[in-house]
C-alpha cells in the first residue's frame, strides 16, 4: 500500500512538471510560428484634420488614403525593405522597415522645403505572448534623430502591433507626417499597416 502511494506521488509530480514545461514551451512555440520575412501590403493613412480625407503626396492632382501607392508614385522610388521576425526563447523582435517621407527645413526659405525624400527606417518591435496566448508588442514611442532639420522622422512616433497572426501582422503608427500638395501644408496623421508573410 505504501509503495502504491509513493508511485502515485511520483506520477503526480511528473505530471505537474510536464504541465509546467508545456506551458513554458507553448509561448515559445507560438512565437516560433512568426519567424521569417514580411512585406508591406497596404498603408491606410487617416487624419483628424478638418476637411481633409485624402492626401496628394506625389503631386499628381489625385488624393488617396492608400499611402503605399502615393509613395510608389514618387519620382525617386525607394527599395521596399522586407521586415523580419527573429526569436530568442519566449521573446521575439520584429525588425519592421517603415518607409517615411523625410522633409528638410531650408535656411533660405521660410517654412519647409517639400523636397521629396523617402527614407526606410528600422523599428524594433518587441513581441511577447500574454497569458491568454495573444501576441503583443511594446509601444515604440519615439525615434531619436540628432538632425533637427529632418521633420518627417522627428514626428514619427507611437508605433505598435495591434493584431497578429503568423501570416498577417497589423501595425499602427500613431503619428506620421505628410506634405499635402493640395493644401500645401504638413499634416499629422496616423497609419494602419498590413504586413503579409513572404
Positions of PLM-derived features:
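Bacterial Sec-dependent N-terminal signal peptides
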Residues: 2-3, 16-44, 195-198
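Bacterial N-terminal signal peptides
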Residues: 8-15
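Short, solvent-exposed loop/hinge segments that bridge or flank secondary-structure elements
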Residues: 35, 39-98, 143-156, 179-180, ...
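Contiguous, well-ordered beta-strand patches that form the walls/edges
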Residues: 73-168, 196
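Edge beta-strand at a domain terminus
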Residues: 155-159, 164-198
Amino acid at each position: 500500500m505504501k509503495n502504491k502511494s509513493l508511485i502515485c506521488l511520483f506520477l503526480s509530480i511528473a505530471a505537474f512538471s510536464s504541465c509546467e514545461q508545456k506551458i513554458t514551451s507553448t509561448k515559445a512555440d507560438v512565437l516560433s510560428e512568426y519567424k521569417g520575412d514580411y512585406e508591406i501590403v497596404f498603408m491606410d493613412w487617416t487624419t483628424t484634420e478638418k476637411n481633409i480625407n485624402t492626401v496628394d503626396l506625389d503631386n499628381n492632382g489625385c488624393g488617396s488614403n492608400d499611402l503605399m501607392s502615393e509613395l510608389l508614385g514618387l519620382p525617386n522610388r525607394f527599395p521596399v525593405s522586407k521586415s523580419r521576425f527573429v526569436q530568442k526563447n519566449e521573446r521575439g523582435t520584429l525588425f519592421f522597415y517603415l518607409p517615411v517621407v523625410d522633409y528638410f527645413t531650408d535656411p533660405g526659405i521660410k517654412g519647409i522645403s517639400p523636397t521629396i525624400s523617402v527614407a526606410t527606417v528600422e523599428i524594433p518591435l518587441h513581441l511577447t505572448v500574454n497569458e491568454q496566448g495573444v501576441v503583443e508588442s511594446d509601444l515604440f514611442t519615439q525615434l531619436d534623430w540628432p538632425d533637427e532639420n529632418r521633420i518627417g522622422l522627428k514626428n514619427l512616433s507611437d508605433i505598435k502591433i495591434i493584431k497578429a497572426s503568423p501570416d498577417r501582422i497589423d501595425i499602427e503608427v500613431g503619428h506620421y507626417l505628410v506634405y499635402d500638395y493640395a493644401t500645401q501644408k504638413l499634416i499629422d496623421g496616423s497609419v494602419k499597416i498590413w504586413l503579409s508573410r513572404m
